[in-house]
Amino acid sequence: MGAGSSSYRPKAIYLDIDGRIQKVVFSKYCNSSDIMDLFCIATGLPRNTTISLLTTDDAMVSIDPTMPANSERTPYKVRPVAVKQVSEREELVQGVLAQVAEQFSRAFKINELKAEVANHLAMLEKRVELEGLKVVEIEKCKSDIKKMREELAARNNRTNCPCKYSFLDNKKLTPRRDVPTYPKYLLSPETIEALRKPTFDVWLWEPNEMLSCLEHMYHDLGLVRDFSINPITLRRWLLCVHDNYRSNPFHNFRHCFCVTQMMYSMVWLCGLQEKFSQMDILVLMTAAICHDLDHPGYNNTYQINARTELAVRYNDISPLENHHCAIAFQILARPECNIFASVPPEGFRQIRQGMITLILATDMARHAEIMDSFKEKMENFDYSNEEHLTLLKMILIKCCDISNEVRPMEVAEPWVDCLLEEYFMQSDREKSEGLPVAPFMDRDKVTKATAQIGFIKFVLIPMFETVTKLFPIVEETMLRPLWESREHYEELKQLDDAMKELQKKTENLTSGATENAPEKTRDAKDNEDRSPPN
């Protein structure tokens, strides 16, 4: 057990009793009286005999727990000094005192034992953590060796392919093999409470703080406990996910956090843990975190029109969403990032299928199809029906994915600027490459107000109204902010229209004044020519 166990080791003393060597063993918790009684018993003397202990050279030895140990070659000699004559009363008093002393001794022993047990537990926890790291590293080495063997076999059998597209995955995943170094923030009670609400301000937090918030969500929902997720693996996985979001204006790690936080708030707001299994909650949260992994900043329309590698690979069918799924499971395939390592194979199959279904549902090209199916099931919604539950989960992740306008205006509006910036980057590229440009992405045709009004009115409000039928609490918390947002952008559009009308009138007046100026000049010149000379 290590050095810590030496404190429990008993002490052995050797006595010379009439030429016979007697070994006496006692623990460090014995007092002097106990040891003296033990020596008396060993030498056949009465227990109340006062004795002295002598070394081989007749030096006296103190009889107490700290007395120096000896060996069989250097035994101590026991010399009786006197036999105490005690009265019955004194014996009774001594007995009581002995019992009191024993109780005190036990109390002190308990405190000492508590301290030592605490130290041992700390040592064991550290050892378990180190052993866990070793297991992860061993699994990583096995995986690396397997991949190297497969690569060698593939190289031996590889032939030249005339295809212009490379189907090798050149994306560099960056899991952390060491223990993650981002600081573990202690979230205040106020932050923990705010984190459960849709009004949470996602702009106030740095990436490390967002990672700590995500980590807290998995612990708070009981997912770490129920699926035996290694906390170190959870942190590695979150770091790797963070590193595989690009620095796009909109589709970045903050958007990932925003969507996941909204999912987390809906779990608490709608009491989803009462409706879904813990595996469903795990799928919802993990799909939300992974739903836009490695997003390039250009949507599916661009991928298909530009015939990119992703469009070719996935046959124009939700190329981005398929790519997000692929990256998610490439990360999870690495032992040091596999948060599902303790989940049985059948459970992992269900989790994988669930995540794929939800991430593919975030393709807005499928919005009408999914909404129609959900509305059909809403007439007789059955929580015991797996198909109904799957559709509800698809709607939930869709709500969270496009939920910015549910948040307070000061939190939501900056996201519109980010989205338009990404749209304009794409439309500029489409123009330069001679590809079709969507009007809602063209910087020459769209404004913030026009971009939002139609989206809120025809996409967001109908979807959240449908969810409200199952969860009435959503109306006040999430639907009402959408109505207010619609009114805000309609007022903004009226102001924009008024400004355009005023600008148009100003331009007309300026243009008219410019055209009339030459005519007046010509008339003045003609009058001057007609006037008589002086």
Curated annotation (Swiss-Prot):
Q: How is the cofactor bound?
A: Binds 1 Zn(2+) ion per subunit. Binds 2 divalent metal cations per subunit: site 1 preferentially binds zinc, while site 2 has a preference for magnesium. Tightly binds zinc. Binds 1 Mg(2+) ions per subunit. Binds 2 divalent metal cations per subunit: site 1 preferentially binds zinc, while site 2 has a preference for magnesium. Binds magnesium less tightly than zinc.
Q: Which cofactor does it need?
A: Zn(2+); Mg(2+)
Could you tell me which pathway this protein works in?
Purine metabolism; 3',5'-cyclic GMP degradation; GMP from 3',5'-cyclic GMP: step 1/1
Keyword entries, A-Z: Cell membrane, Cell projection, cGMP, Cytoplasm, Endoplasmic reticulum, Golgi apparatus, Hydrolase, Magnesium, Membrane, Metal-binding, Phosphoprotein, Zinc
Tell me if Mitochondrion is a UniProt keyword of this record.
Answer: no
Which positions, given as ranges, span the membrane?
A: none
Q: What is its EC number?
A: 3.1.4.35
GO terms for biological process? cAMP-mediated signaling; cGMP catabolic process; cGMP metabolic process; negative regulation of neural precursor cell proliferation; positive regulation of cardiac muscle hypertrophy; positive regulation of long-term synaptic potentiation
Per UniProt, what is one GO molecular function of this protein? 3',5'-cyclic-AMP phosphodiesterase activity
Entries under Pfam families matching the protein: PDEase_I
Activity regulation information from UniProt: Specifically inhibited by BAY-73-6691 (1-(2-chlorophenyl)-6-((2R)-3,3,3- trifluoro-2-methylpropyl)-1,5-dihydro-4H-pyrazolo(3,4-d)pyrimidine-4-one). Specifically inhibited by PF-04447943 (6-[(3S,4S)-4-methyl-1-(pyrimidin-2-ylmethyl)pyrrolidin-3-yl]-1-(tetrahydro-2H-pyran-4-yl)-1,5-dihydro-4H-pyrazolo[3,4-d]pyrimidin-4-one).
Active-site residues from the entry = 251 (proton donor)
**Protein location:** Cell projection, Ruffle membrane; Cytoplasm, Perinuclear region; Golgi apparatus; Endoplasmic reticulum
Quickly give the catalysed reaction.
Answer: 3',5'-cyclic GMP + H2O = GMP + H(+)
Report the sequence similarity comment from the record. Belongs to the cyclic nucleotide phosphodiesterase family. PDE9 subfamily.
Oligomeric and partner information? Homodimer.
What protein name applies here? High affinity cGMP-specific 3',5'-cyclic phosphodiesterase 9A
Q: What does UniProt list as this organism's lineage?
A: Eukaryota, Metazoa, Chordata, Craniata, Vertebrata
Gene name as annotated: Pde9a
